[in-house]
Amino acid sequence: MDHRAFIAGLTASQRAGLTEKSNAKGLAGLALHFGLIVLVGGLIAVGVPGWQFLMMVQGILIIFLFTLLHETIHRTAFHSPLLNDRVARLCGFLIVVPSDWFRYFHYAHHRHTQDPDNDPELAGGKPDTVWEYLVHISGLPTWWSEWKTLFENASGRCETSFVPVNGRDRVRREAVVSLLLYGFLALVSIVSGLHLLLYVWVIPSLLGQPFLRLYLLAEHGRCPFVANMLENSRTTYTNALVRKLAWNMPYHAEHHSYPTVPFHKLPDLHSLIKEHLNSTSDGYTAFHADYLTNLRDVSSKS
């Protein structure tokens, strides 16, 4: 069974229940995620013992706002479209992934999942050697790509196929405003001599990015280049803490099969679809152990 046949087999009441959005559940998740960021940031700011270690915790919390950004650009985090768009813009700003541009990018990824010629997530390929793997999870290529894209968009040189011509002015304005705000915050920090943002935002984000790279690689890494979402996307079985941090996106095959299902309904969808999943892993450690074993320069020595 492929994902289309599965969705076609759902009853009208099942579809209605699975796609029901909730401001309350979204706001509860938002309050928890940002509440932890403010709490940990406050502990770093006052210099509690071990505050240096807390920068990594802060970084993981901040960089995993990517998963909330992802949920909001689908407009499934909240029932309110305006709330989705405002939160998306905030999350995108904090992690240097502008929300309007990312919506175009991500929708192209959904239309062409695991299509080597059209899926923008496959641009540049996946790591195939130990060195490529280490560089990938460092997050450095990601930061380079994000800042490069931001400057290209701001200059009006956004010519990627997934951004429609009538959307390019919007993407450009978003990039210009973002760069102006980043510049303003940097200037205020330098002039005032206060380095708070460096320790509660910038350095933590650098420390947190590798954890997001490790997480995201499991979503489609080593999945086949086919159209069936039950094969080309991976569900990773993990603990409740990771699912909460990632807004239930470890249920990734479920999300790709039925993208209009909000994060809080994905466990329900999983219970219905789990017997048909073809790409799963028993945790992120298991996934990466298998991935490393099958890297080209590792497997050739076995």
Model-based region annotation:
Residues G59-T72, P98-W101, W143-T149, W201-A227:
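Transmembrane alpha-helical segments that form the membrane-embedded catalytic/substrate-channel core
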Residues F162-G221, S233-A240, W247-M249:
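C-terminal membrane-associated helical module and adjoining short loops/tails
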Residues G17-E20, E71-H79:
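Transmembrane alpha-helical segments that serve as helix-helix packing and pore/cofactor-lining elements
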Residues A77-V96, D117-E132, A227-V242:
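Juxtamembrane helix-capping/reentrant segments at transmembrane boundaries
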Residues V40, I73, A77-F78, A227, ...:
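Active-site-flanking alpha-helical
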Residues I44-L68, R86, L90-D100, S205, ...:
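Membrane-embedded alpha-helical segments that form the functional core of polytopic membrane enzymes
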Residues L65-R75, F102-Q114, Y215-R222, L245-V261:
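Histidine-centered catalytic micro-motifs
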Residues M1-L61, F93-L198, F263-S302:
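Non-catalytic, topology-defining segments of multipass membrane proteins
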